[in-house]
Amino acid sequence: RLQTNPLQQIQVALGFETVGRGHADNEAIKLLASILGGTMSSRLFIEVRERRGLCYTVRAAVDSYDDVGTFVIRAGLDASRLKLAMDVIVKEVKKIAAHGVTKEELAMAKDHVRGGLMLRLEDSSERAEFFGRQSLFFNEVIGPEDRLKQFDAVTVADVARVAKQILDMKAMSIAAIGPYKNAKQLLAQFPTL
C-alpha cells in the first residue's frame, strides 16, 4: 500500500505475518524483534543508522492478536536514501533468517526484555495493565518472574527457527507514505526479493 505525501521524508514498513497471542513461539519472536531492531544496539540500528546514517529511525516490533500477529520493520528516512536503506535492511533480514543469532545477542535481548518489564512494573497503571491484559486475554495471570522465565527458556535455536519461518521475503508486505506517485515507482527502490 502506498500513500502519497509531497514531503521528501518517507515512512516505510515491511511486514511479516506471525503467530497469535498465546502461541509458544511468541517469546522467541519478541526476542528476534529486539535483536533485529528493538534497541540502539540492534542489528538494524547499527547497520542502517549508526554506520551508514541512512535513516532517522529504524526499528522492529511485534504485535500479537488472538489468532495472528505481525512482525514489522519500520524506518523513517529521506526519500533519496530509500534504495540504499532498503538494500541494507533486506540484507540484514535475509542474514538473520539464514544464519540466526549469536548467544551474546540473545543474552542482550533477554536483558533488554527483563529491564523493560521491571521498569514498566514500577508504574502502578502499567502494573495493572500487565495483570489485566493477562486476565482478559488468557483467563490466567502469570507473575512477572514467571513471565521472564518464559523468555529465559528461549534458545538460540528457537530464535533461528522463528526467524527462518517468519522472515520470508516472498511473503513480506510493504506500506509506505512518501513522495512517490505510484507503487511501481516506490517498488523500484527495493532490491530484488
PLM regions and their residue ranges:
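Short conserved micro-motifs at the rims of enzyme active sites and ligand-binding pockets
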Residues: 24-27, 124-125, 185-188
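Proteolytic maturation boundary segments
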Residues: 1-2, 168-193
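M16 family metallopeptidases and their MPP-like homologs
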Residues: 13-19, 49-154, 169-177
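Short, conserved charged micro-motifs
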Residues: 23-24, 81-85, 183-185
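His/Glu-based metal-binding/catalytic segments typifying zinc-dependent metallopeptidases
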Residues: 1-43, 150, 180
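Short, conserved catalytic/metal-binding micro-motifs enriched in Asp/Glu and His
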Residues: 30, 159, 174
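A short, acidic, amphipathic alpha-helical segment used as a generic capping/interface helix at domain edges
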Residues: 154-164
